Each structure stands twice: as structure tokens, then as C-alpha cells.
């Protein structure tokens, strides 16, 4: 009947709207994650640069007799932590890119 057809069409439109909302939500989340991870990589690179500088300075100061081995070891630990954070940031960024490509079907 005509009434059933209208009801069926209404249900179809609601389902389509629901699917569109879900897709938009997934896309928005993927874009947000991508932006966040790009920022994390930038920050991690800056921290890595500072850790390199700090380690160079601590090593130089130690060789000049101005710093202790503890200072060098502390700088090495900071460098290792910065390096680990950079690797994790790159990994998170790659995962965010993969999720974005999945959502956009690239």
C-alpha cells in the first residue's frame, strides 16, 4: 500500500542519515587525530633537538672537567627518553594516517 511505501521510504532515509552521521563522525575523529599527531611529532622533534644539544654540552663540559659523569648520564637518559618519544610520535602519526585513509577509502 501507499502508506507502507511511505513508511519504508522514511525508514530508508533515517538509516541513510544515520550512516552519513557515522561517516562524518569517523572522518572528524580521524582528522582530529591526524592533526594531534602531527603536532606531537613537531614537539617531539623539538625536544629531540634540545636533548641533542644538552648531551653535547654535558659531554663537552665533562671533557673540560666542568661537569660530572652524573651530568652526562642524566643527559644521555634525557636523550633516550626524547628519542623514544619521537619514535612513538612517528608511530602514532602513521597510525593516524592509516585510519584517515581507511575512513576516506584511499
Model-derived regions: residue spans:
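Amphipathic alpha-helical coiled-coil segments
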Residues: 4-85, 92-103
